[in-house]
Amino acid sequence: MPSPHFSKVLVFGATGEVGSAVALEAHALGAHVSIALRDTTKHNEWISPSQEHAADLQRISADLTDPDSLKRAVHDTGAQAAFIYAVRSKDTLRGAITALRDAGIQYLVFLSTSQVRTAGTTKGDIRSIKPDHFIPWQHAQVEIALEELEVPHAAVRAGFFASNPLRIYLDRSSEPKQVNLLAPEVPHDPIDPKDIGRAAAAVLVNPRLYASGYQGEPKKDVVYLSGPALLSQTEQWEIINRELVAAGKPEVKVNHITVEQYLENLAKLHVPDVVAKSLAKSMVETRALYAPEDYEKSRGNVELLTGRKATAFDEFVKREIPRYFD
């Protein structure tokens, strides 16, 4: 294996489904990986203790809302590059980005969202996204901060998480389990969060920015990631129920709901209203996001970056059934 461009990396969000995959894949690519945690004793449901030990993951105390902790983390680990994600902060992570840069981080990979492409008044202009479309606006603000602070970076603009139907929308409190679908026939591009993490790790450890022949912006690499097939929520749940039956488990009851009911359900889950409304908007307005000329390019990027085909939705469901239905 060739030596990695960055041999020491710092990964935030490693107790989540994407960050955990970033950490493990960065190790597999030859980097020494430190995982930044607010609570270094926190249980990690995505990386087992044996995996953490085998990958020699170093737990370090750091918080993206605490710039001083970031400076200490970089100094203590000697990290040259870091993976970050959007967290709620008054300055849209400008303080965190500045602290990481000033402490010695040379390059950042930011987990963004593909929604930023079409959420603004002008396609592709992240500065034209309004705050009321909160999710893409929040991610766009971090990208803008990275640009204005002149930090070399990659914006990994990921599509619809394949885990959303199971992690967010499945009601496991009812019997039989049920799901309430808003805009069931609208297409989405479900992508395995592990594929997102692996692709992000590839551009974290060996950035395309520094590869010979790179022709993009000098300090910004934009990476769009989509799943291998466009599927409506109806099609997704047909697949989920088929795999449940094959596994000897009861099917999930599928209900169709209005926007008002969708917002009520998210309110019960204590999702902030501004986030809930942005989620509703993103569930309904996807056709521009998956324009053929854009989707055909992004669907191949997982394989391009990782050398492995993107996980099909049915394969993802088979793998995750024990997590959500046992």
Curated annotation (Swiss-Prot):
Phenotype of gene-disrupted mutants: Leads to decreased production of bikaverin.
Annotated function: Nitrogen metabolite regulation-like protein involved in the regulation of the gene cluster that mediates the biosynthesis of bikaverin, a red pigment also considered as a mycotoxin.
One of the Pfam families matching this protein, by short name: NmrA
Positions bound to NADP(+): 13-18, 161-164
Name of this chain's protein: Nitrogen metabolite regulation-like protein bik4
Induction of expression: Expression is repressed at alkaline ambient pH and highly induced under nitrogen starvation and acidic pH conditions.
Organism: Gibberella fujikuroi (strain CBS 195.34 / IMI 58289 / NRRL A-6831)
Alphabetical UniProt keywords: NAD
UniProt family annotation: Belongs to the NmrA-type oxidoreductase family.
